[in-house]
Amino acid sequence: IRAVVDTGLARIARYNPRTGTTSLRVSRISQASCEQRRGRCGRTGPGLCVRLYGEEDFQSREPFTVPEIQRANLAEVILQMISLRLGDPGRFPFIDPPPAAAIRDGYRSLRELGALTANQRLTANGRLMARLPLDPRLSRIIIEGMGLGATREIIVLAAALAIQDPRVRPPDKEHKADEVHRQFLDRKSDFLALL
């Protein structure tokens, strides 16, 4: 790579424990991430990094990125740790320990999904969920769909729920994009529209 154009932005996953959702928001990256981008150009020869922000903006950024384990939904991590018998996630010696509230939230979510018993043991569904490399909510949906004989349809829906909204609306072509998207509209259900 000879040249890098750095916007200073990236889509960063953040979990909101209040709503129980993870969203990818365009956010400012840390100084360390900016330096990493700069380091990508010119490794094998001369390179150029153009930053689309000023020095003052760079200096106002956080020095390092908050570790993902401190900003993510921990339900999947907890499910895998229990499945692999790695011990109590609340006592695990993480390099950057997650907040205790996030661990409690992960356990609560797994109990609600039927993956754990009240005393934190894996259920039969929990063992199946741990085998699927997905958010536990999506793996639970797939297991339920299998039981209803709708595996194919449920996998399509789970895949659609796992990504950002695929409907792109370029600012200068919003009207045209809306017309095209209307072809796939189903007034009864967003899920039917996805299928």
What are these regions (language model features)?
Residues 3, 9-61, 75-79:
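Conserved segment of the helicase C-terminal RecA-like domain
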